[in-house]
Amino acid sequence: SKFLIELFSSDAMKNDGAVLLFRTKSANFDNLKKLTPGDNIRVSVTVLPATFVKGPPEHKVRLQGANELLKLGYQISMNIDPIILTTDTVKTYKKIIDDIKTYFDYSSERFHRITIGMLRFGSKNLDNNIRKRHVDLYRHTKTSKMVKIPGDEKHRYDRELRVELYKSLVE
């Protein structure tokens, strides 16, 4: 990261409009804390409920780490992706949104954006990878309201369901 931050912090890169984006599910930001970020250096942190993520730290820990980076001058984005439909989806993801408000200074001018996305798979991924590596998720795709979108070749929740969920999350 040091090499990349130094490279992207150069005047030439800044003048060209180059942006360096680190995407992570980690809360270990020790290497970034030692460096001085330029205005074009962003860190994008994925925050998901522990129910669906095995391995990465709890989302509150990631939010706190991201907040520390924000205070050090990094631009921060949040990703809530993928949203997986369950009986408690709205409650679960509204809790994450509330935790962003609690553990992260989203009013900072260094806060870049929040992106939200639903679970989706390319047909090849579904058959070749997901079925073998994530049996429960594969079963979910077969028993939920996921459909293959013509022309897109991706399995997604149907549009009406996605729009309904997005609306309920922003209310």
Can you name each region flagged by the protein language model?
Residues 98-171:
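Auxiliary Fe-S-binding modules of radical SAM enzymes
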Residues 29-37, 89-97, 127-129:
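Distinct, well-ordered alpha-helical segments
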Residues 1-7, 55-65, 91-101, 158-170:
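Well-ordered, non-membrane alpha-helical segments in soluble/globular domains
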Residues 10-16, 65-76, 106-110, 160-171:
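A structural motif corresponding to the C-terminal end of an alpha-helix
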Residues 30, 53, 84-86, 139:
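Generic, ordered loop/turn and secondary-structure boundary motif
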Residues 1-62, 75-79, 111-117:
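Core AdoMet radical
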Residues 61-125:
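Conserved C-terminal portion of the radical SAM core fold
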Residues 39-44, 65-76, 129-144:
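A glycine-rich, aromatic-flanked flexible loop/lid motif
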